[in-house]
């Protein structure tokens, strides 16, 4: 299985140019090794600026972006990826995702184009995002050696047991976006109790719970140095069995990201 760093910096809705650049620079200098962006975020250039300002060696961080749904025809996959690399100021990304199985997505044709980008050296691995278990099965039939991750919303209020099981079955990583449930984790009683017990934040509890699981990586968005640091410190938090059981048994569900074109 491709080794994806357990904690990454998400950059969705990080649209203030200076703030975005600074957050990427701060994260890398703090020790983050995984940066996640996307074409639709319209901040690849600012992310690239942050990478450059941090003066980190390219092999020291794992960089991911995503092709938007209107660019998933074979020719657009290639041209838009080239554009992404130019904006990011790099010669390759470690992981390029199909952002949603929607729009111009055609399993056979789209994945063929992605595989060609691996052969040309522009991307190292293929990712899918927001794929259902059935869609993941289909994609894995077409590109079993190249798909390494399915990025989906996952947090204590959306635990994704079935999808995680499917990712483990295929020996790929589930990359959890919105791992703090858009701030809702601060309002979950079970997380409040565990945070108080360990004298940490609810964000750290949620992230530690995710990262404790096999095949799971988390990419919380953060812009301030304080939040970037708080999230990073979750790597040092060890939850006990009682904590994990308490979170696992939360039955309330809340999906935060649900566009009209979602496949579920």
Where are these regions (language model features)?
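N-terminal binding-site loop/beta-alpha segment at the start of enzyme catalytic domains
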Residues: 1-61, 252, 262-263
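Alpha-helix N-cap/helix-start motif at helix boundaries, enriched for small hydrophobics
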Residues: 9, 35-37, 93, 126, ...
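Acidic-and-aromatic substrate-binding clefts and catalytic sites of carbohydrate-active enzymes
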Residues: 15-18, 36-46, 70-75, 103-106, ...
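Short, acidic/polar
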Residues: 15-28, 73-88, 109, 136-137
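A structural motif
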Residues: 32, 90-93, 123, 215
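A short, structured active-site edge motif that brings together acidic residues
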Residues: 59-71, 94-101, 130, 154
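CE4/NodB-like, metal-dependent polysaccharide N-deacetylase domain
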Residues: 77-97, 116-120, 142
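Beta/alpha (TIM)-barrel catalytic core signal, keyed to glycine-rich beta->alpha loops juxtaposed to Asp/Glu
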Residues: 101-264
């Amino acid at each position: 299985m491709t080794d994806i760093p357990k904690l990454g910096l998400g950059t969705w809705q990080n649209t203030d140019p200076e703030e975005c650049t600074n957050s990427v620079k701060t994260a890398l200098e703090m020790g983050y090794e995984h940066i996640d962006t996307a074409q639709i975020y319209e901040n690849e250039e600012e992310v690239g600026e942050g990478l450059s300002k941090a003066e980190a060696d390219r092999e020291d961080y794992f960089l991911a972006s995503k092709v938007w749904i209107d660019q998933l025809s074979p020719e657009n996959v290639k041209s838009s990826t080239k554009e992404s690399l130019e904006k990011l100021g790099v010669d390759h990304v470690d992981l390029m995702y199909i952002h949603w199985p929607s729009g111009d997505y055609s399993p056979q044709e789209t994945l063929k184009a992605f595989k060609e980008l691996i052969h040309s050296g522009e991307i190292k691995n293929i990712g899918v995002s927001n794929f259902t278990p059935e869609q993941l099965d289909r994609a894995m039939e077409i590109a079993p050696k190249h798909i390494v991750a399915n990025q989906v919303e996952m947090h204590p209020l959306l635990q994704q047991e079935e999808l995680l099981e499917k990712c483990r079955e295929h020996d790929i990583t589930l990359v959890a976006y919105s791992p703090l449930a858009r701030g809702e984790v601060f309002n979950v009683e079970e997380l409040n109790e565990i945070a108080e017990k360990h004298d940490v934040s609810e964000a750290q509890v949620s992230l530690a719970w995710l990262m404790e699981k096999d095949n799971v990586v988390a990419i919380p968005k953060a812009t301030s140095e304080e939040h970037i640091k708080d999230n990073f410190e979750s790597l040092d938090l060890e939850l006990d069995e009682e904590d994990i059981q308490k979170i696992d048994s939360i039955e309330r569900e809340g999906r935060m990201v649900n566009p009209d074109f979602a496949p579920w």
